[in-house]
């Protein structure tokens, strides 16, 4: 079996079990919640697992239909968690780029950069050739003591506006003809990449940190 990233500065990207991704998701990622996980891949540096990326079904059926319509709603996956503990240059894009090669073909991969909430631009997606399709629409979420309320009896007065996010889409394809077909079905416009300062958070105090730049613009 070919291992993506083999002999590339000691880095490898390999499939991992869901349980191997959980410590990264629950203890490091700012959301601190476990999403739907259909595929998980790890970044190994000199044999040590230092990061993971997970893909799963989008949380909302409307996301699936919104990408390319009813016909392709089952072809949509979401890159829903990306966690790197070794922030060395290009590790994040190396992990994402190589994991995309391991996913099933002829799928739409949607992911979001939380620009309004966390100051994320999405340079890792730009570096791995995702298509930029604009900002999501803002809408209100229901919360109870700061947590999403998934039960009946929602207090309509206890609602907050969800941050709009930059939406990125990648198409895995089996051949160029299929890529053209899937691209034609895409329901969002393809726009120029956004630029600007991007920020990350302190793992012990996950709030946006303006002064810390993670990915820098090169082009």
Give names to the regions the model predicted.
Residues 180-219:
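Short, cationic low-complexity segments
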Residues 157-180:
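A conserved mid-domain beta-alpha-beta active-site/ligand-binding segment of alpha/beta enzyme cores
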Residues 1-36:
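Short amphipathic alpha-helix that is part of the acyltransferase structural core
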Residues 35-38, 196-198:
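A short, aromatic/hydrophobic, helix- or strand-capping loop or linear motif
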Residues 39-41, 75, 164-168:
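Short beta-strand micro-motifs in enzyme catalytic cores
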Residues 12-15, 56-160, 170:
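Acyl-donor binding region in acyl/amide transferases
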Residues 25, 38-55:
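Conserved beta-hairpin
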């Amino acid at each position: 079996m070919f291992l993506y990233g083999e002999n590339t500065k000691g880095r490898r990207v390999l499939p991992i079990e869901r349980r191997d991704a959980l410590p990264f998701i629950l203890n490091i990622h700012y959301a601190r919640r476990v999403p739907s996980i259909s595929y998980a891949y790890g970044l190994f540096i000199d044999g040590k697992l230092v990061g993971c990326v997970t893909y799963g079904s989008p949380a909302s059926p409307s996301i699936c239909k919104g990408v390319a319509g009813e016909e392709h709603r089952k072809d949509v996956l979401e890159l829903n968690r990306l966690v790197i503990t070794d922030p060395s240059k290009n590790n994040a894009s190396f992990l994402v780029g190589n994991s995309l090669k391991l996913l099933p073909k002829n799928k739409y991969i949607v992911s979001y950069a939380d620009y309004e909430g966390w100051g994320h631009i999405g340079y890792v997606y730009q570096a791995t050739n995702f298509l930029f399709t604009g900002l999501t629409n803002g809408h209100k979420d229901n919360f109870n003591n700061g947590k999403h309320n998934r039960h009946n009896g929602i207090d309509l007065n206890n609602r907050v506006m969800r941050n709009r996010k930059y939406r990125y889409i990648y198409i895995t394809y089996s051949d160029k003809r299929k890529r053209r077909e899937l691209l034609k079905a895409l329901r969002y416009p393809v726009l120029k990449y956004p630029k600007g300062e991007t920020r990350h958070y302190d793992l012990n105090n996950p709030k946006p940190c303006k002064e810390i730049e993670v990915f820098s613009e090169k082009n």
